[in-house]
């Protein structure tokens, strides 16, 4: 446990950021899975779900949750399946 005041604050800030990042990553994964399932089942709303997945991947990449190349790769593979 840190003794210095600034180190204590950093621990608190990091914990908050960790929670927020985990939730954002989970939401991103959920939208991507929904899009993949829609493409696999050839659902009517697959285009909307693909757009949502692309948006969430781009947002995660811009926030630094995932690398931009990883986002591009996932988007490319999703588009290829569709």
From Swiss-Prot:
GO terms for molecular function: small ribosomal subunit rRNA binding; structural constituent of ribosome. SUPFAM superfamilies: Ribosomal protein S20. Keywords: Ribonucleoprotein, Ribosomal protein, RNA-binding, rRNA-binding. GO terms for biological process: translation. The keyword rRNA-binding applies. Gene3D superfamilies: Ribosomal protein S20. It comes from the Bacteria. GO terms for cellular component: cytosol; small ribosomal subunit. Belongs to the bacterial ribosomal protein bS20 family. PANTHER family: 30S RIBOSOMAL PROTEIN S20 (PTHR33398), SMALL RIBOSOMAL SUBUNIT PROTEIN BS20C (PTHR33398:SF1). Binds directly to 16S ribosomal RNA. HAMAP family: Ribosomal_bS20. This is Small ribosomal subunit protein bS20.
